[in-house]
Amino acid sequence: MSMVVYNNQGGEEGNPFAGALTEFSQWLWSRPLGNPGAEDVEEEAIAAQEELEFPEDEAQARHSCLQRTTSWATPKEVSPSGRVYQTVRLSRMEYSRPTMSIRSQASYFSSSARPLPPPPAPSLMSWTPIAKYHPSSPTSTSSKLRRAAPKLIKRG
């Protein structure tokens, strides 16, 4: 069983779920994984962070990811592999420039009888906006067009 809990793009302002998501993520990350009475417990934790800068746009992008996997021995009747694996991950991304800021946060939890392949990590290059901001030039209008008065059409 695996599920993505929430993905919030667009920041926390005006989002009624933002506070609940933060609380849930903190709760999920602080929970002890695994079976408290189990023997032969193995745990692995990974923390990663990357940053990109776009000087031409005065923009920055950041991604941080925390992941913890716990496994423990279990009877073959419970799990054919003889182990149970639980993984929890918290991923946060942010893109900001002088005119905008985008934040995204996702929590992930899985529990399985065999180690699951890690889902693809989000890439900052695919996540950051690809369209660059180009201020539009003012449209030019002819002076004759600006002075023209509307014409009335009579129907009779």
UniProtKB/Swiss-Prot annotation:
Region Homodimerization, as annotated, extends over: 38-54
Q: Which residues cross the membrane?
A: none
Q: Where is the protein found, in the record's own terms?
A: Host cell junction, Host plasmodesma; Host chloroplast envelope; Host Golgi apparatus; Host mitochondrion outer membrane
Q: Where is the composition biased (Basic residues)?
A: 144-156
Q: Which Pfam families match?
A: Luteo_Vpg (PF01659)
Any one GO biological process: transport of virus in host, cell to cell
What superkingdom heads the lineage? Answer: Viruses
Principal localization reads: host cell
Q: Where is this region: Disordered?
A: 106-156
Q: Which GO terms describe its cellular component?
A: host cell Golgi apparatus; host cell mitochondrial outer membrane; host cell plasmodesma; membrane
- The ranges of region (RNA-binding) come to 57-156
UniProt modification remark: Expressed as a nonphosphorylated 20kDa form and a phosphorylated 22kDa form. Phosphorylated by a host PKC-related kinase. Serine phosphorylation is required for plamodesma targeting.
Q: What is known of its domains?
A: The N-terminus is involved in homodimerization. The C-terminus binds ssRNA. The C-terminus is phosphorylated.
Family, according to the entry, reads as follows: Belongs to the polerovirus movement protein family.
Question: What is its quaternary makeup?
Answer: Homodimer.
- Protein name (record): Movement protein P17
